[in-house]
């Protein structure tokens, strides 16, 4: 009797592999809403047709799932999202104009057609997480009309986010004022010193400093390439010297290159070429003749790295001088902290008592933005 396809191990392995591969591709999507929607649809359809005995139906489902997975793998999120309609048995159409508008915004952002609506998508993702959390705690019903989501729950979600932002600001003020600190980054073994403060962090960092750090790291990479080349040349030079010594007097050094020459390496900010204390090697003019140019190059590299290190050591001393760069940023940071503290106290006294999440100009987000506080929604 012919075995049904659902009992074949090859079929089960293929379906399971395709299912897992599709979920991995879904995880690459940036939008939280689209990612959740696709995972939900794929999982529900897989469970629904788990016991389906119709070969034609299963073939059609697997073919559609394979196409959906290929679209996601090629970063064609918009096409993959449109395939969900054909993948589902029953397509739920937008109940009103509002839902259709929200879906249009999400699709445009996924295809990079309208980047200005990124804030809108951020709010929708925030609303989605808010509703999911409340439903998990059984504080909201499973089915909520779209009008309630937009007009009632979205302001509450933004209000909750604003409260968390206020708490973070309050905790920051409790820790004390802003402080400048001396920091460094490594370019090999060289420390590049600079000042960190809230005045020059992230995008406010000096373009000159960024270029300086980048150029120093590139220089160090060039030194590493030169050292690698010297290491290779030293190995060849040693073998050439041994061969010429053999041609001169018939004496053959019965050793490998590592016996006479350690690898060229960067250690404690210095490049070293060390010969083994072997009298036969030291007295051999051929070896000295071949290895001396390499040793000269290594000494030049060592001097170069020492000069870079001394340069930034002097820079550190200059930064820490009285009335120098460090003192300037320290005073500036204290002044900015005092101004922020005054603004915060004025905001708490005059504006926060009248917060209303359902009125845009009285919401916490609007109040924070009016007072110059960054809000990412």
From Swiss-Prot:
GO terms for biological process: mitochondrial genome maintenance; mitochondrial tRNA 5'-end processing; vacuolar acidification. Keywords: Mitochondrion. It is found in: Mitochondrion. Disulfide bonds: none annotated. Its main location: mitochondrion. GO terms for cellular component: matrix side of mitochondrial inner membrane. Belongs to the RRG1 family. Essential for respiratory growth and required for mitochondrial protein synthesis. Required for vacuolar acidification. This is Required for respiratory growth protein 1, mitochondrial. It comes from Candida glabrata (strain ATCC 2001 / BCRC 20586 / JCM 3761 / NBRC 0622 / NRRL Y-65 / CBS 138) (Yeast). The lineage of its organism: Eukaryota, Fungi, Dikarya, Ascomycota, Saccharomycotina.
